[in-house]
Design a protein with these regions (language model features):
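Membrane-embedded alpha-helical bundles that constitute the cytochrome b-like, heme-associated redox core
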Residues: 2-247
Length: 247
């Protein structure tokens, strides 16, 4: 993945320092800022963003329809789980997109990074916590075993990973990166935080695929063609868009 490779030249961590004035000569003979080459959204980036949004619409609308077209009373607390988790993944993805591609200057970088933090802490994490808690409580009140399917097991891994991801990300930027021995060391940690984030998104999408296609509940709801559209087409569209926009 190219996420890590170029980070030395243009780290995403907010900094009061301006980008390096170093210049590079382009193959065509022109001269440009080294950091600007990959930071301006291209037509490809915009098409990739459209791919993400189309995929999200398919997944979000299908997940909600499967729940709210059924008997909510019979579903009980389970009815909270799919809507909240689908909103959580939406928030995670929307929290990432302001940083894709990396902003071209320190002011824009800081503003977009604040947006990233606000979406993650204010929406994505709380929604994930609500959706996961509802599922755990639903299992508890029915005396059902936890984490017996691949969806459940990967869901647990995802939640733990999210907690670690958020903790490391916060530690790498708050307080000037003191938790990792200073800003420079924190920047190196942050590179791998970003890489970990892309891998985490992949795991999230696969976990949703297992729920939407292979779970007993989803199969019991029917709507096979709709689920294929959302979870066999929509999810790959999201993943492809995220990967194309990564740097």
């Amino acid at each position: 993945m190219s996420t890590v490779g170029r980070e030395e030249a243009s780290p995403l961590l907010p900094s009061t320092a301006e980008p390096s004035p170093s210049r590079v000569t382009l193959e065509e003979g022109g001269v440009g800022s080294a950091g600007d080459l990959d930071m301006v959204p291209t037509r490809r980036d915009k098409l990739a963003l459209a791919s993400i949004l189309i995929g999200l619409i398919l997944v979000l609308s299908t997940s909600w329809y499967l729940v709210f077209s059924g008997n909510l009373k019979e579903m009980g607390w389970f009815a909270v789980h799919p809507p909240m988790q689908s909103l959580a993944i939406t928030a995670f993805l929307l929290g990432i997109t302001p940083l894709q591609p990396p902003p071209p200057n320190s002011t824009t970088k800081k503003n977009r990074f604040k947006t990233h933090q606000s979406v993650m802490l204010g929406f994505a994490l709380p929604l994930l916590a609500i959706g996961s808690s509802a599922m755990i409580y639903n299992k508890y009140i029915h005396g059902a075993k936890h984490f017996t399917t691949w969806h459940g097991k990967l869901g647990l891994i995802t939640v733990i990973w999210v907690i670690l991801q958020a903790s490391i990300g916060a530690a790498s930027v708050w307080g000037g990166g003191k938790a990792f021995g200073g800003e420079e060391k924190a920047k190196r940690v942050y590179k791998y935080h970003r890489l970990s984030g892309y891998l985490l998104i992949t795991l999230m999408l696969f976990t949703i695929h297992l729920a939407g296609i292979h779970s007993d509940w989803a199969n019991g709801r029917g709507y096979t063609n709709l689920r294929i559209l959302a979870y066999y087409i929509g999810l790959p569209l999201i993943w492809l868009g995220i990967e194309i926009r990564s740097r």
